[in-house]
Amino acid sequence: VSDSGRCAAADPHQRGLIAREAVALLHIMKLAVGIRDIAHLRAVQQARAKADPPLRHHTRNMPRRGDEIVDGGSIYWVIAGAVMARQAVREIIADTWDDGSPCAGLVLDPVLVPVSPRLTRPFQGWRYLAAEDAPPDLAALPRGVGEAAMPADMQRALRELGLL
C-alpha cells in the first residue's frame, strides 16, 4: 500500500487475491459562507472551475480520514443555516492557496444534489458527518410530501432552486 493509502499496482489486494478491509463511508459538512442558495453555489463553483480546474474546495488541513471520504463520501453544504446540498468528493489532494502556502484540495463532482434541509448551528472549518447522520437526497424522498399544501408560486420558486 502506498503512502496515500491507495493500492500499488502489484498489491495483491488490488488484484483481488486478498479480501480488502471495508472502509466506513464518511462525509464532510461545510458552511458555504456568503452563498444565498443552491443556484448561487452552482454559479460560484462553475466560475471557479472554469478559471482554475478541476473544481475543488480548499481547506487548511488535510482530513486524516480522507480514505473514508473519497470512497463514496460527499461534502454537505450548509447554506443559510441549513444543510441544503451535497457533492461527491472525488479526490483529496495536496494543493496551495493563491499565496502559495500549502493546503488540502477536495476535488468535487460538479453535480450539486439537493438534500432534505436540516437546520444546523454555525461552526468553524468543516466537520465529519457519519453516513447514518447525513440527510437524504430530496430525489430519494416520496414525491409530493407536503407539496400539495404549498402555494403555486412557492412551488415554482423551490423548483427554480432545484429543491422540488
Region roles according to the model:
Residues 2, 7, 15-43:
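Short, extreme N-terminal leader segments that mark the start of a protein/domain
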Residues 27, 71, 102-104:
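A generic structural signal for short beta-strands and their flanking turns/coil linkers
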Residues 41, 72, 85-89, 150, ...:
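Amphipathic alpha-helical interface surfaces
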Residues 41-48, 157:
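Residues that form generic nucleotide/phosphate-binding pockets
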Residues 46-86:
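Short, well-structured hydrophobic secondary-structure segments
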Residues 88-136:
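Aromatic- and Lys/Arg-enriched surface recognition patch
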Residues 123-164:
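Well-ordered alpha/beta subsegment
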